[in-house]
Regions:
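Charge-rich, low-complexity segments
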Residues: 1-67, 177-180, 187-195
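Long beta-strand-rich cores associated with HINT superfamily self-processing modules
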Residues: 63, 76-183
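Terminal, regulation- and interaction-focused segments at domain boundaries
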Residues: 69-75
């Protein structure tokens, strides 16, 4: 029962995201989104997070303090697509932008890049509506590759040489950024030839 409104909020937001992608495809004969992943935290994960934050373990506390119970990850092709999708989502009048963090413009010290937005999404009841937060992470394919590898090699491991890992992942982030830049330039060049 606790998860139900978060699922409804995520479903509502997924409709908006799919409309955005379809409209973009129709208007520009292109589409910014490669794929979309969704997840809802398990009860155990929610309770663990409340415990870690030393908060009371109940529905009301979780609702008031956790903004990542429902999450959507949007994987785009290029950085410009990430910003386009983020701007479009912020324009929807039925959504509330609660918080945003641009880790593309200002990557985390370890090299992590992504655009995070916490959106308040309306959930309608018979005689009222209530907003539930959905964490939206928007990143490119190369940013997602970096994050997936970092999660697999460092985050999930207990025996890590942090200094070496940090250096390798910073270099990896730079190489991926260069690859993405070259591919974007190639795409733009090809679009000019077609146009």
């Amino acid at each position: 029962q606790f998860i139900k409104p978060y699922q409804e909020a995520m479903d509502f937001l997924m409709v908006q995201i799919n409309i955005l992608n379809d409209d973009y495809r129709e208007k520009y004969k292109d589409y910014p989104i490669h794929n979309i992943q969704t997840r809802i935290k398990t009860k155990e994960s929610i309770l663990g997070k409340l415990e870690k934050k030393e908060l009371k373990k109940d529905f009301e506390t979780a609702k008031n303090h956790l903004t990542d119970i429902a999450g959507i990850r949007i994987i785009c092709y290029f950085e410009s697509d990430v910003y386009h999708v983020a701007e479009q989502l912020k324009k929807y009048t039925d959504l509330i932008c609660m918080r945003e963090s641009d880790y593309i413009a200002k990557p985390k010290p370890n090299g992590y890049k992504s655009y995070h937005i916490i959106l308040g999404v309306p959930v309608y009841h018979t005689d009222s509506k209530e907003y539930y937060p959905v964490e939206v992470q928007i990143r490119t394919l190369t940013m997602d590759l970096w994050a997936s590898m970092e999660h697999r090699i460092i985050y999930k491991s207990s025996n890590v040489n942090m200094e070496k890992s940090r250096q390798v992942f910073l270099e990896f982030a730079e190489e991926l950024r260069d690859c993405e830049k070259q591919l974007f330039e190639l795409k733009e060049e090809n679009n000019k030839k077609e146009g």
